Amino acid sequence: DTINEWMAGDDLGAIHARVMGWQGDDSWLCKARDGFAHGSPLAASWIFRQLNQTQEATLEAVFESELILGCNIMRHPEFAEGVRALLVDKDRSPAWAYPDLASVPANIVDSFFTAPADMPVLGLPG
């Protein structure tokens, strides 16, 4: 029930406010809230868009979208910064490109959903 309450609607800012305002004591939900609080605002933006745009998609379309998104994520400096902060320096202090959800430009999020010219073809049966 809590997750459904958190995720209601199509406004990521409102969802973020509900999650951050939650005062429960469930350890799993606390970990999810803390991850959202400290994670990349850019990543939260493309994750939210991916979840919304593939809700009614075919499995083939979801896989294709995941491939496009994955190729673009790996090319973006935000991914390397997350790896650096968590696995390399282990300082857990990433310098995200955007400080909050409101500062993430829509055209940057859009760019994650455009296939790179050199992306491999998934070739699933249609």
Model-derived regions, located:
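C-terminal alpha-helix plus adjacent terminal tail
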Residues: 1-126
